[in-house]
Amino acid sequence: MKMKTLATVAAAAALLCAGQIASAKDKLDNIIESGKLRCAVVLDFPPMGSRDASNNPVGFDVDYCNDLAKVLGVKPEIVGTSFADRIPALVSNRVDIVAGSTSDTLERAKTAGMSIPYFAFTMVVLTRDDKKITNYADLKGRPVGNTVSTFEAIALEKDVKAWNNKKGSFLSFPTQADTIQAVSQGKIDATVVTSTVAFASIKSGKYDKRLKVGGNAPYPIDYVSLLAPRTEYGLINYLNLFVSQQVRTGRYAELYKKWVGDGKAPDLMVPGVYY
């Protein structure tokens, strides 16, 4: 009887351990086992994300997702997402990660896990030549606007309120394309966008020929992160190493040249700070 009891206990323990091992699998394991990486990308934010003439997703963020899927040994699935829906798509499990040029704010970090920065943006004023705007200070008392849920929208609206000029106003738009179109059509006098977006928009030929950069915006460098579920530390650690490898292998510089242009790719660290 004792031998049978010991055998029963051993079998139960083995089953318990097996169950614990199975339950210990995390998001990274699940992605690899599924054979697919669902990656959210904002596809109206060239050159980071857009669609080509055949409606295929293209851009820096798209290539970044493809690179990540390749090293994971899975197939990439690009999920077109708006700026406002990046984190909701993640927390509702519609995507596995977000490569949507998402600013690494402390507020967002309450909801989503963030990698070390994989890209960094500087901001400029986008306007039309006939609006006679040559610097950021010229936006005081002007109708301006920006894309909802973006870093630059929050900063610009805050300044409009601080200026407290009765002639000034701020409008929100659902997409980046809507914001740029509003500037192009004269619905607003200016907006603030990344330098990459500004030059890509002017170069595209899709908008009014008077579209131009009206100086730099005095915003801090916008460091952006890959997003993963907040408690999935195994996946977040993997993303951190992946970003580091992209830089060390020269792939980051290669993608920058391909999608943005010649010149040095932005540094991904605050000087004197170890992220």
Per-range role (PLM):
Residues 25-101:
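Extracytoplasmic small-molecule ligand-binding "clamshell" domains
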Residues 102-110, 155-159, 184, 189-220:
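A ligand-binding cleft/hinge motif common to bilobed small-molecule-binding domains
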Residues 70-71, 79-80, 84-98, 111-113, ...:
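Short helices/loops that flank or line small-molecule/ion binding pockets
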Residues 28, 60-61, 108-118, 212-216, ...:
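A structural signal for short loop-to-beta-strand junctions that line the ligand-binding cleft
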Residues 65-74, 152-172, 202-207:
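Ligand-binding cleft/hinge of the Venus flytrap
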Residues 127-144:
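Flexible hinge/capping segments at coil-to-helix
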Residues 119-127, 205-241, 262-275:
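Periplasmic-binding protein-like
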Residues 40-45, 79-84, 93-105, 121, ...:
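Beta->alpha turn/N-cap motifs
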